[in-house]
Regions:
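Periplasmic peptidoglycan-binding/tethering modules of Gram-negative envelope proteins
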Residues: 1-51, 125
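Periplasmic OmpA-like peptidoglycan-binding domain that tethers envelope proteins to the cell wall
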Residues: 27-34, 53-125
Length: 125
């Protein structure tokens, strides 16, 4: 089988994902995202067999179709950033799920904030 990905690396990827920020209603990455995304680049450089799936999610505010496009665009922005730092595009995939996979209640601002997110999943195969 493939070597197991360490808990520490999984934690670093999850911290990075939680620190990805965009302009409101936009797929433009904010500069404060860069440090943690650079950590993802470092992990991928250290582990050439690892791949990353990048998933974008939105809250339920606004039209479903716009949220779907926004979630896809945001995931693609993260992918583009990683490629710009030298990660081979073949190791990255991105997808958007719009508002279809909430992790919190969309009725509250705090819940909506949790639902607006990027998730990154490492694989080693």
């Amino acid at each position: 089988g493939c070597p197991v990905i360490s808990e520490e690396i999984i934690k670093r990827i999850n911290v990075a994902a939680k620190n990805v920020f965009f302009s409101t209603g936009s797929a433009k990455l904010l500069a404060k995202s860069n440090a943690k995304l650079n950590d993802v680049v470092a992990i991928l450089n250290e582990n050439p067999t690892y791949k990353v799936q990048i998933d974008g999610h939105t809250d339920s505010q606004g039209a479903d179709d716009k949220n779907q496009v926004l979630s896809e665009s945001r995931a693609a922005s993260v992918k583009t950033y990683l490629v710009s730092k030298g990660v081979d595009e073949s190791r990255l995939s991105s997808a958007g799920y719009g508002e279809t996979k909430p992790v919190a209640d969309n009725k509250t601002a705090a819940g909506r904030a949790k639902n607006r997110r990027v998730e990154m999943t490492l694989s080693n195969y």
